[in-house]
Amino acid sequence: MVVELQHSTFKNLKVFITGTSSGIGHAVSKAYLERGSIVYGIDNKNNKSLNLQFKNFEFHNCNVQNYKKMSLIVKKILKKSKSIDVLINCAGIIDFKSIEKSTIDFWKKIIDVNLTGTFISCKLIAPSMKKNKKGSIINVSSRAAKFGGLDETAYCASKFGVEGLSRSLYEECKKYNVFVNTITPGTPIKTSMSKKTYSDEKRKIWKDPYLISPAFLHL
């Protein structure tokens, strides 16, 4: 059951979300949009369903690790809207290779999206939140940040990094009334990424990502 929160709390809230074209990012975007928030979506693929369904959704096509383009997008948004109230980093990728088969390029690809991409969004948006003395940053973590997984050296390292980044940024931002949290989906969630990770047995119990959207709304 999805917990209902007062829609007035979210009306005209300005929310910046990465990875909005599918999975958790898409579901969380929809949850905010349904409650009247203005959502700025970032992804390198455009799922037009949100554009067609909600007038309060603004999509930007960009790879999260592209600092130059991300910087231009954030500057454009801040110039127009004056503030971003919530930052949610959902963009991520996963792949499996043994240490012998993990090339430097493979390592960089995982780290660049999952960790560097999260850092870039935080670097570009956190300063404006600190200046405005309010804000919420939510970074999507993983069980891989708690436990090592077979053939997941790059992915686990990227998610351990997200945890460390988030804890350090929390210490930096808390005196400015800016909150930094991570969310670790514990239940198997049905996403394009999880098709690679879950066995047929786990897929029998996996859940729609929309069901975890209240966790983001509460933060």
PLM-predicted stretches and their roles:
Residues 98-99, 106-108:
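Substrate-binding pocket helix/loop in short-chain dehydrogenase/reductase
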